[in-house]
Regions:
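Flexible mid-to-C-terminal extensions adjoining Fe-S/redox cofactors in radical SAM and related proteins
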Residues: 5, 359-452
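Non-cysteine beta-strand/loop elements that form the S-adenosyl-L-methionine
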Residues: 191-194, 199-210, 279-287
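C-terminal accessory regions of radical SAM enzymes
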Residues: 316-360, 391-411
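Short glycine-enriched, charge-decorated loop/helix-capping segments at active-site entrances
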Residues: 113-117, 215-223, 415
Length: 452
């Protein structure tokens, strides 16, 4: 028997905590147990002298993955889980942009140079239906994300396609859907329509408080959008007050840069004043730009980690709960759609991509419904699917590899936008501390009712 390479031992509120990043097991130790384990438990592959430990402690820590068999190779186990998740064929995930047109004119939009007036045609819809049909009998789940452009400009097309997808799935395949929208057209009537269309989650971006948001997320005529989006959120508050309504969850992505980062605490306080935090889930999203080498516009990873902790703590104080992105650390295998087998992005002309950020850029398309696979670009998909962080020397020796698996989306890695490992480590530790600081868990720890 030996120690896991993924053990962390630390103190919290005077208590002794042991965490394993591969199993995400958490244990509280007595002072005597801590003293016996501290010299070796965080060291990799140290043989354990079971005679110095109580049998029950050895049993519990083995169950949590803190102690493992001498012959067990944790890296191989991670690689197996990673490729099993990546090549899982039980689900089909399609991100569909029914249009690249948009009622906004955001200066940073990566779709600004694409053909923004394109709208999905009947031929492409038919190609989509046939594509989904080809997976029936193979998949158990069909997941659609409506994207754009602004998808709500094509609500009738979404209704039509949803009807066809549900008919194809019938009782054989579970159907679910989500949407990313700028929120301007998301009024009460539209929200209820999306509920009927089985849209279970909606994401709306903000670029800060009113002044800064309106500067970058402006309408095509240059006017602001902040007040309208807030008014929309307020308009359907009463619907969420009725807990019997099974309405879409709403997450608010707060795009964070050097210019607007001071707005974010003010923004969640404003959302609280409007009673919007009861049914929306805001979270900070770091904006990266590979051309911003000196961090003129983007926050450094360390700055963002500090801001995120402050934001999460303030949010917890305001609401008594954690943000949607400030949760107990979870082991991951596939990072996103890029490195998942049956995950594709479809543009209005039927071109197929592996990443949202590639949409509309034909040179990155791996094929289309008319001509099939493009063998000139398919290697890009192979690069996404076959990247193995355990072959990276730094990653393979990292204690948080199971929670990170390379630390950045495949698209950004290919384009050399690499993560800060120190920031990732800080974020995971902050999230773990935030979990321990939640009222119920903290009381359990301090009352010593927290079981191994």
């Amino acid at each position: 028997m030996k120690t896991s390479r993924y053990n962390f031992l630390f103190k919290f509120e005077g208590k002794n905590i042991l965490f394993n990043s591969k199993t995400t097991a958490l244990a509280m130790l007595s002072d005597d147990e801590y003293d016996k384990l501290a010299p070796f438990v965080e060291k990799e592959s140290i043989s354990i002298d079971a005679d110095i430990l109580e049998p029950d402690l050895v049993k519990h820590l083995s169950y949590g993955g803190f102690f493992i068999d001498d012959s067990f190779d944790e890296i191989k186990s991670l690689r197996f889980d990673m490729f099993k998740a990546r090549f899982n064929s039980s689900s089909l995930s399609l991100t569909i942009a029914p249009t690249l047109a948009c009622n906004f004119n955001c200066p940073y939009c990566y779709e600004r140079t694409s053909s923004r007036n394109l709208t999905i045609t009947d031929d492409v819809k038919q190609g989509l239906y046939e594509f989904v049909k080809s997976y029936i009998g193979i998949i158990n789940n069909l997941s659609i994300t409506w994207y754009g452009g602004e998808p709500l400009l094509c609500l009738k097309d979404i209704e039509e396609m949803t009807t066809h997808f549900k008919e194809i799935c019938k009782d054989k395949v579970f159907y679910s859907a989500g949407m990313t929208t700028n929120g301007y057209l998301l009024d009460k009537e539209t929200l209820l329509k999306l509920k009927d269309l089985s849209v279970s989650n909606i994401q709306i971006p903000f670029d800060g408080f009113k002044e800064k948001h309106d500067k970058t997320r402006c309408l095509s005529d240059g006017s602001g959008s902040f007040d309208k989006i807030i008014a929309n959120l307020v308009s359907f508050k009463s619907l969420y007050d009725d807990k019997n309504n099974k309405l879409p969850s709403i997450s608010l992505r707060l795009n964070t840069t050097r210019e607007n980062h001071k707005d974010m605490i003010k923004l969640i306080n404003y959302l609280k004043e409007k009673d919007l935090l009861d049914y929306t889930s805001p979270y900070l999203a770091k904006i990266d730009d590979p051309l911003d080498k000196v961090y003129k516009h983007c926050l450094t990873y360390e700055e963002f980690a500090l801001l995120e902790k402050e934001f999460n703590d303030d949010y917890a104080s305001l609401t008594g709960k954690q943000t949607s992105r400030n949760s107990y650390p979870e082991k991951i295998s596939a990072v996103c759609g890029c490195d998942s087998l049956n995950s594709y992005v479809i543009d209005p002309q039927g071109y197929i991509y592996k990443c949202w950020e590639e949409i509309g850029k034909r040179e990155f398309a791996i094929g289309n419904f008319k001509d099939g696979v493009d063998y000139k670009t398919i290697d890009r998909a192979y690069d996404y699917m076959l990247y193995d962080p355990s072959e990276d020397l730094k990653c393979s020796n990292c204690k948080i590899l199971p929670l990170c698996m390379g630390g950045v989306c495949p698209y950004r890695r290919i384009n050399n936008v690499l993560p800060s490992c120190d920031n990732k480590m800080k974020t995971i530790k902050n999230n773990l501390m935030s979990f321990l600081n939640t009222k119920e868990i903290k009381e359990a720890v301090l009352n010593e009712s927290f079981a191994n």
